[in-house]
């Protein structure tokens, strides 16, 4: 993947200012609420029976934060994202049996939550960079499935 200087700057800036404790839980909660079939991978998280329960679930919040810290690894290794996520790809495919389409659903939710947080600062150029970055991560996480 080729990254322009502008894309690198946008991605680095967004993640350096991102409140992981806010964005992570909101993004994962949104994914579990909007796409309820994704909940099957989180059966050990306790009560996920409705939106209120999901939004208040400490395990969901903690995993959302963990996901964003995982994305931070990609930000720091933008030139080698596939290798950065090789072990996670194996874990999610061979042990957890996560449907790889779920990575795309979560990336869409991350984009929505970041856009809502940034407001008008989330320009089309910003969106393009964010979605490109997340698409590369999603592809890397799905490598083991192919």
UniProtKB/Swiss-Prot annotation:
InterPro entries: Globin, Globin-like_sf, Globin/Proto, Hemoglobin_b, Hemoglobin_oxygen_transport. Coiled coil: none annotated. Keywords: Heme, Iron, Metal-binding, Oxygen transport, Transport. GO terms for molecular function: haptoglobin binding; heme binding; metal ion binding; organic acid binding; oxygen binding; oxygen carrier activity; peroxidase activity. Belongs to the globin family. Residues 2-146 form the Globin domain. This is Hemoglobin subunit beta. One of its GO terms (biological process) is hydrogen peroxide catabolic process. This fish has two hemoglobins: Hb1 and Hb2. Hb1 is a tetramer of two alpha-2 chains and two beta chains, while Hb2 is a tetramer of two alpha-2 chains and two beta chains. Heme b binds at residues 63, 92. One of its GO terms (cellular component) is hemoglobin complex. It comes from Notothenia angustata. SUPFAM superfamilies: Globin-like. It comes from the Eukaryota. Pfam families: Globin. Involved in oxygen transport from gills to the various peripheral tissues. Red blood cells.
């Amino acid at each position: 993947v080729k990254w322009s200087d502008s894309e690198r700057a946008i991605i680095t800036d967004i993640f350096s200012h991102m409140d992981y404790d806010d964005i992570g839980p909101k993004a994962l909660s949104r994914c579990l609420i909007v796409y309820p079939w994704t909940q099957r991978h989180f059966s050990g998280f306790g009560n996920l029976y409705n939106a209120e329960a999901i939004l208040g679930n400490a395990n969901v919040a903690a995993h959302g934060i963990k996901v964003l810290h995982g994305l931070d690894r990609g930000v720091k290794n933008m030139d080698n994202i596939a290798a950065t996520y090789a072990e996670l790809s194996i874990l999610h495919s061979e042990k957890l049996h996560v449907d790889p389409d779920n990575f795309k659903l979560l990336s869409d939710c991350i984009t929505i939550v970041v856009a809502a947080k940034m407001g008008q600062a989330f320009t089309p150029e910003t969106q393009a960079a964010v979605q490109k970055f997340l698409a590369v991560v999603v592809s890397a996480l799905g490598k083991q499935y192919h």
